[in-house]
Amino acid sequence: MIKTAALLLATFAAASVTQPARAQAAPVAALTKSPAACPALLKHSFKRLQDEAPQDLCQYAGKVVLVVNTASYCGYTKQYEGLEKIYSKYAGRGFVVLGFPSNDFNQESSNAKEIADLCFNTYGVKFPMFATTSVKGPQANPLHTSLIKLTGQEPKWNFNKYLIGRDGKVIEYFPSKVAPEDKQLTSKIEAAL
C-alpha cells in the first residue's frame, strides 16, 4: 500500500512537471465590450434620489441622453408619464432619460422621500433620478452649467429638456411645452439612435 501511494505521488509529480503550462484565461474586461470614452459633458457624478449614492454619468457614454429638470408640484409634472413611456420605448436601443429634481421655480418638495415616492410609486419612473439640485443661475450644477453654455438656453421652467447624442454633443434644447411624446422630440431621438 505504501509502495502504491509512493508510486502515485511520483506519477503525479512527473505529470505536473511535464505538462505544458496552460494559457491563462483572458481577463473578463477583455471579453466584454469596452464602454465608449466618456465625453466631457458627462464627466460628472451626482447623488441618486432614492439613496444618495453617487452615480457617475460616464456610464451613459455612447447613449442618447435626455436631461430633464423636474418638479413635483408643477402643471407639467404629468410629463413623468411621457418621459417613462419614451424611456421604455427606446431604452433597448441605447436611450436614457436623466431626471434632475429642482426647486429653482419653487415647485419641488424639500423632502427626498416625497419626491422619490411621487416619481417611483405614483408615476412608475424607472429611469435614473438624481437628488434635488439647482439647474440655473450661479448655483447650477456642473452638467446644467455646461448645457446652458453649449446651447445658450437656461431652463426657464420645470421640465426643460436637453437631448445629447451618442458622441456627447448636445443635439437640441426643448422647452417645457414640448411634451416627451411630441414628434418634435421623438423624431430627434429616433434620428440620434
Model regions and ranges:
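N-terminal "domain-start" segment that seeds a small globular fold
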Residues: 26-58, 78
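Short active-site neighborhood of thiol/selenol oxidoreductases, capturing the structured segment around
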Residues: 56-75, 83, 97-100
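Positively charged n-region of N-terminal signal peptides that target proteins for export
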Residues: 1-4
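Structural microenvironment flanking redox-active thiols in thiol-disulfide oxidoreductases
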Residues: 76-140
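Bacterial N-terminal signal peptides
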Residues: 6-16
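Loop/turn elements at helix/coil->beta-strand transitions in domains of secreted/extracellular proteins
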Residues: 61-65, 91-96, 123-128, 158-159, ...
